[in-house]
Regions:
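Intrinsically disordered, charged low-complexity linkers and terminal tails
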Residues: 1-166
Length: 166
């Protein structure tokens, strides 16, 4: 899947979203370390995007959602707030989920909320895809781990490229 360019689709989904969260996938996220962690660890900053507010630190919270991934793969996944750890994790991606492999370590995870119950996610692997995506929204690698609102629009030079590729 790394040979396909999903950048234009990720830019389009982000531009239609209310909020987007980006992060570089860690070795724990992709299973490279062989640890027991399940799913993708997300920043606490994404809690309002998922739950509407930051959960009370002493209360576990779950939210079931459907995510459409690149290649139109759909998952019925769960966001779980672990109060004891102060962690938010995306789990229940399903057996054989094609995108969280060790070779995806360092890839850019793009997670967008398109409407109240519609989410999209992309894994951008190549340096060119990652750079083009970040540039489209005036972001840099230092902005990973944050949520943003794309209401400022696309950079003009990438807007045309996204329309052509779509």
């Amino acid at each position: 899947m790394a040979d396909q360019n999903f950048c234009a689709a990720a830019i389009d989904a982000t531009s239609r979203s209310t909020n987007t969260y980006i992060k570089f996938l860690s070795a724990n996220d992709t299973g490279l370390t062989g640890g027991h962690q399940s799913g993708v660890l997300l920043s606490k900053k994404t809690c309002p995007m998922i739950f509407g507010e930051l959960p009370d630190e002493h209360v576990a919270k779950r939210e079931n959602i459907r995510i459409t991934w690149q290649d139109d793969v759909k998952t019925d996944s769960t966001f779980t707030w672990y109060e004891s750890k102060g962690e938010l994790r995306l789990t229940r991606l399903g057996r054989g989920f094609p995108y969280l492999k060790p070779e995806e370590t360092g890839a850019l995870f793009v997670f967008s909320r398109l409407s109240e119950d519609e989410y999209s996610a992309y894994i951008l692997v190549s340096e060119i895809e990652i750079e083009d995506y970040l540039t489209a929204f005036g972001l840099g690698p230092q902005d990973a781990g944050n949520m943003f609102s794309p209401s400022a629009g696309l950079a003009p030079e990438l807007d045309e490229a996204a329309e052509i590729a779509a």
